[in-house]
Amino acid sequence: MKLDLFLLAIIPILIGMFWIRSKDRYCREPLIHLIKFFLIGAFLSVIIILLENLLMKFNVFEGYSELIYVSFVVAGLVEEGVKALILIPALIKEKHFTEKLDGIIYSVFLALGFATIENMVYIFSESRNLALQVGINRAVISIPAHVMFAITMGYYISKYKFEGNKNKRREYLFMAVLIPILLHGVFDFILMIEYRWAIILLIVYVIILWKINLDKLEKYMNHSKKVFFGNLRKKKKK
């Protein structure tokens, strides 16, 4: 294994982990539990890759129909669907999932576990020169996109967990699964369009994703801060 390619694959992941960890400032999750979800994501990548390869054998489409099938079904549905299938029940059972921000933190760690193996596969399956280009492209575009999909999923899982209304809970559960699938599908669809203007569209799309999801993240960070200092004041009164 070439060290420089390995570092190219792993450094963006480590940056993502430190970044999202830094957002959990007041009631921090135990690192061992975050690593557990990271490893779950890495394990899921094997299952996801096998499922994607299987579905590609049923690809009988051409043109834009093929792009839709590959981006929304093979990539979006399988990757985000499998993550949600495992993440949601695992998170609901997680005893340290005590505030809304936690849903995002755990979701991103799981997604980064998946992205680690995916990065390795993409980078080490190419020739050296192409591997460097692939690694840089993924570090700048693909890894941040995975983080954004995970923030969306974690955001709605948290709304599902802490909502008292049953109808609302079902709605949030549905959104936790469907919205990341659609966001991922649109991302891959744009990525596969063979037009020069597609890269501009992709950059705009990623910027919009960042803006929307950073707002979601900030909302839960503010909620975490409010809860922390609220509990602190209650303890002082006692």
UniProtKB/Swiss-Prot annotation:
The protein's matches in InterPro entries, at most eight in alphabetical order, are given as:
Peptidase_PrsW_arch/bac (IPR023596), PrsW (IPR026898)
Its EC number is 3.4.-.-
For this UniProt record, give its keywords in alphabetical order, as a comma-separated list: Cell membrane, Hydrolase, Membrane, Protease, Transducer, Transmembrane, Transmembrane helix
Which subcellular locations apply to this protein?
Answer: Cell membrane
State which ranges are Cytoplasmic (membrane side): 22-30, 93-103, 160-172, 218-238
Q: What GO MF terms are annotated? A: peptidase activity
One GO term under biological process is: signal transduction
Q: What does this protein do?
A: Involved in the degradation of specific anti-sigma factors, specifically RsiT. Involved in the regulation of extracytoplasmic function sigma factors expression. Seems to play a role in the resistance to antimicrobial peptides. Required for colonization or survival in the host cecum.
Q: What is this protein called?
A: Protease PrsW
Q: Which organism is it from?
A: Clostridioides difficile (strain 630)
Taxonomic classification: Bacteria, Bacillati, Bacillota, Clostridia, Peptostreptococcales
